[in-house]
Regions:
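Short acidic-hydrophobic, aromatic-tinged amphipathic segments that line or gate anion-handling sites
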Residues: 106-108
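Short beta-strand/loop segment at the start of cytosolic alpha/beta domains
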Residues: 1-24
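Amphipathic alpha-helical interaction surfaces in cytosolic regulatory modules
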Residues: 31-104
């Protein structure tokens, strides 16, 4: 299953392979785009136990975006699954470090 969708200033690409979900984010994960990302996640969360998020093209993240990542992490933790962030650039990493999310989320 491949779903592509424009989300305000952010493009998301969801690919689900059985219980594994791959999400590619491009643009800004902000107050406008986070709710739509969350809505899509809520639709499919029951069918996944592992999430890989590819962030190479993510240019900006706000607290709304961080909340979505935390919710995804908590959901996967309940299922004894995993959430892994890939390709985090230096600007996004700085936000994750300042907020302490680098100690909560698995980043490779």
């Amino acid at each position: 299953m491949v779903i592509e969708k424009e989300v305000r200033k952010m493009k998301t690409d969801f690919k689900q392979h059985e219980a594994k979900l791959e999400i590619t984010l491009e643009g800004e994960l902000n107050t406008h785009s986070a709710p739509e990302l969350d809505a899509k996640f809520q639709e499919i969360k029951d069918s996944v136990s592992s999430i890989d998020i590819y962030m190479e093209r993510l240019t900006y993240i706000t607290s709304a975006g961080l909340r979505i990542l935390l919710a995804m992490e908590q959901e996967m933790e309940q299922k004894e699954g995993a959430l892994v962030l890939h390709g985090v650039n230096s600007e996004i990493m700085e936000v994750l470090e300042i907020t302490g999310f680098d100690t909560i989320l698995e980043i490779v």
